[in-house]
Amino acid sequence: MRTVPKVSTVCEAGEADVPDAGAPYAEARDLEECIGIALGSPTRFGNMAAPLKYFLDGTGAQWHAGSLQGKPAALFTSTGSLHGGQETTLLSMMLPLLHHGMLIVGLPYSEIDLQTTRQGGTPYGASHVAGMAGDAPVSDAEKRLAIALGRRLAEVARKLAR
């Protein structure tokens, strides 16, 4: 598990080089070394959050080298409301990965929870409706869909690594 540093709207360093606690910061080489990636971001106005965008924008060397081509990727997000931009956020996260030649793993409608959800979950990836205060727990359906997505990613990565 990795995270990305925060970015600032002012011209100054916003984060230490190494986090004091929690997941270590992702580095571009982490993408090169993995056989599959699950990439997540909170939704900001229907887009991925700026720190993830900044990180992905810094992967030009990997794009030029083609080092991420053929790797599977799955996506997940969380929004404040049901119509808060889950699908557009997941789509915005797909774009740089497709430019890298990565293979997007989504959720098929054979997942019953995807057909019946009144909360999070899309064919583009797993999602959670956190509520405007951010305090809504992950529903059972959201949890099952996230697990199904992780399982699909692992299965695809294993098959491609053979």
Segments (PLM) and residue ranges:
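Short, glycine-/small-residue-rich phosphate/pyrophosphate-handling segment
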Residues: Q69-T122
